[in-house]
Amino acid sequence: MSKDFLLEIGMEEMPAKFAPGAVTQMENNARKMLQELRLEYKNLKVYVTPRRLCLYVQELAEKQQDIKEEAKGPAKKAAYDADGQPTKAAVGFARGQGVAVEDLYLKEFNGVPYVYALKQLPGEDTEKLLPKFCLDLIASLNFPKPMRWGHYEVRFARPIRWLVALFGDQIIPFSYVGLQSGRTTQGHRTLGGYVRLTKPAEYLEALEAAYVIADQDRRKETIRQQIKALAAKVGGYVDEDEDLLTEVNNLLEYPTALLGEVDVKYMILPEEVITTPMKEHQRYFPVRGEDGKLLPYFVTVRNGDSTSLDLVKEGNKKVLKARLEDAAFYYREDLKKPLPSLVPQLDRVVYHEKLGTVGQRVERLRKLSALIADYLGLKSEQKELVDRTALLAKADLITHMVYDFPELQGIMGAYYAGSNGEPSEVCQGIMEHYMPRFAGDDFPRCFTGKVVSIADKLDAIVGAFGVGIQPTGSQDPYALRRQALGVVGMLMQEEKDLSLHVLIQDSYRIFADQKITLEPLEKIRPALEDFFKQRIRYLLQENGLRYDVLDAVLAQQADRPYSIAGQAKALAACRKEAGFISYLNAYVRCANLSKKASGAPWAPSDLADPTEIELWNKLQQIAPVVKSKTDKLDFLEAYTQAAQLVPDIEKLFEAVMIMVEEESLRAARLGLLQECVKTLGCLGDLTQLA
């Protein structure tokens, strides 16, 4: 038998950003706790709105599963006398376990026979277990910035104001923060009232009658469709912005979308100047025409019904107008000062107390960008554009617009540089040097943006590690992981195969040139290189490469992301070929035996058997070709060439014993195997695949 179970935690308005994590936590914790309680159920769902967090368990068993438990008793010699009759020890053990002495059985433990009893433990009624389950579940939820209220010691997202707990039509009684659980929930703060539930199945329908759509998935889809319909009325559409849609969804309980107008005088502003206040500050959805350009409309969503919608629309329009008026003023004021004139002011802006000013950082970016441009083989005119980009990259931090809208850094710099007549490559580079800004963002497309972006991120990472700032667990306040992923991702696109080891060294030296004291390079280099290695692994795994393939490649080198990516892809492809198993076996056997080499010099002339001499001669022909192909990063062809050695290696193992008594011959054979490992290892350390 089973019944539906409902637990609702009603509270004051919870920040929208708390909602996704709360849902995940509540669902995971509830599943784990129900499993530990041996309570079966059909389905489990968590609902969330700003004012409630609800667990709904469908067809929860009315009773725990019965279990059988084996208990170990005294040894056989103590449990039975010489005649095989149970002793007092056996009788007492049986009584203590609640079984008949005849039901005891023997079983060996560490070679000694003991008596055992199999106990049948009946499950408890679910109704008795649920009060503690509710209390434990509520207490298990954590939030980024929880609150305390009243005289209570507990913390929660926001003060809890009511509790509902129903198992079928029965209230599950418990008390928490001075509140008693019951069957009464609350509807919309202004449109709904108190809602009395007789059973969990009524929950969604009863709340919707009180102007609350509790199912966040349905609420989100309702918003999506309303927005789409309103934008279509003016011949437009709204960009797919799941983050904004999710945030809006978690800000309200009963969505009603409305279409607002933007004063056309603001439409001459740069697009981002219009959309940023809309999206970031007001949570409005900008409307675009079929050509992709902004239309003078926006869609917003109110938390309520359609009552007085025109009044609400006018209020939203006024708020946006004030925002855009400020933005227009800042934009006009910023245009009065050429972007290059702002660069000296960066000397007065502190980047980090131990890493100097932003002005000093700009000088570091120029020097590091110049080195990267050299490594990439850029032409002199391209290098000049890179230097100009690095010089102006941070200048917009001084502007009014970026001060008020920090998310526009780089974007406004590009607009201002363009208005000053800077080359398009410089403008694009200023905008792109912050990319990728977030997971899944594009990499810079322009060479200026790419070079300065690599320099910018390397400077941030090396500087942070140099003053003891490293990501720990989920904490990464300087977004160093994202920046490292950006560096690695961009280097994987560069055919020049740049070295992280060299770039880290260059960045460190530039800090030293400015007399900025960092931890010794030899102290931080291992952590830095391992940090980048993990980012390389992550990116390639995201691209579908197996962990053992990456183990094989990264065991060989973790310095050059471009060649690592090429080598890993080649290994993954070669692994599928019919002859790869033989290749792998040959490599592993050579590698394992060659570890026994003493390291002493050996002479090919000491090789005696025709099979080993033939292998050595063939190796002399093939090894240079394999090295040449590997140096050119043509790993597939390198593998094809190296694979020619496999039949000869197999013949060698059939014909001779490697570990012979004669020292010079043994050394020569082990040396030969070492050379084979070097050539066959063109795809990585293949012992990682064995």
Show the residue positions of the predicted features.
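Amphipathic alpha-helical "coupling" segments that flank catalytic cores
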Residues: 1-690
